[in-house]
Amino acid sequence: MMAGGGSGRCLFTATQWQELEHQALIYKYMAAGAPVPPDLLLHLRHRAAAAAAADVDTVPSLAFPPHHLGWGCYGAAAAQYGRRVEDPEPGRCRRTDGKKWRCSREAYGESKYCEKHMHRGKNRSRKPVEMPPPAAAAVYRPSALSISPPPHDADAPSYGAGAGAPLQLHLDSFHASTSPPPSYHRYAHTSSAPLFPSSAAGYGGGWSLSKEHCLTLGGAAADLSLDKPADHHHDATSATTEKPLRRFFDEWPRSDDGRTPWDGTQLSISIPTAAAASPDLAIAGAASRYHSNGDHLRTSE
């Protein structure tokens, strides 16, 4: 290139002109998007090494440090404009507060966060409610106890004021659980009144006492019969045997072989009367019983 004004002097030397042509050729490859041939780059490296050995003042291009090829110099700018930056600690939870703090726990599985921060961004109202297992939901319910009097019968013996009628108990269980809780029988579950009257406390729960004759103070001895209900293991159609109780062994009936039948249980019953409260009444009652027994013996003879 020649300078204007008729001076005839060149602005660039031959070496500089050759270098400009070489750089223009590299620029054409870069503008076309084609890869730059290695021999052109190798020539630049040799020229840079030779210039480093020479004086810095003679080579103005060496006054500025050369830039490395690639995207290294644009890393900070790329991070600011949305380009993904590699995580320096891949296995660490990425939950941060937007500043300097970062979670120190390890990431769970393939997730980027730990177990604590995995569901932090989701709506917690949609989390399924944990239901208790069916075994734990079973609650003990007490058995329903109903008491009903026996059906009235015209032929049934009447009970006095001192003896109460037997009660029938119906027990319906819900079977909600196998066993009640240990604190169930402690409070407010005991019966306030006894189920059976006090007059029948001396006898078993399955025995019923019936009177055939009225008892009078100082009167004749009453014949008592002890009825035992049929066992639930036996047939319901079998009738219960009724045996009268006698005051003396001589009054017991004899069997065919002349022996007294002792196949049953011997039971002696003493009936308290109102005469036991006063000594005079007790003496009068004993005298009246003595006379009545004598009359009974004479009648039997």
Swiss-Prot record:
Descriptive protein name: Growth-regulating factor 2
Domain WRC intervals: 87-131
Locus of motif Bipartite nuclear localization signal: 83-102, 120-127
UniProt similarity note: Belongs to the GRF family.
Keyword Metal-binding annotated: no
Annotated SMART domains: QLQ
Gene that this sequence comes from: GRF2
Chief site of localization: nucleus
GO CC terms: nucleus
Purpose: Transcription activator that plays a regulatory role in gibberellin-induced stem elongation.
Keywords: Activator, Nucleus, Transcription, Transcription regulation
QLQ domain: residues covered: 11-46
Record-level GO BP terms: developmental process; DNA-templated transcription; regulation of DNA-templated transcription
UniProt xrefs under Pfam families: QLQ, WRC
Entry's Gene Ontology molecular function annotations: ATP binding
InterPro entries hit by this protein: Gln-Leu-Gln_QLQ, GRF, WRC_dom
Subcellular location: Nucleus
UniProt domain comment: The QLQ domain and WRC domain may be involved in protein-protein interaction and DNA-binding, respectively.
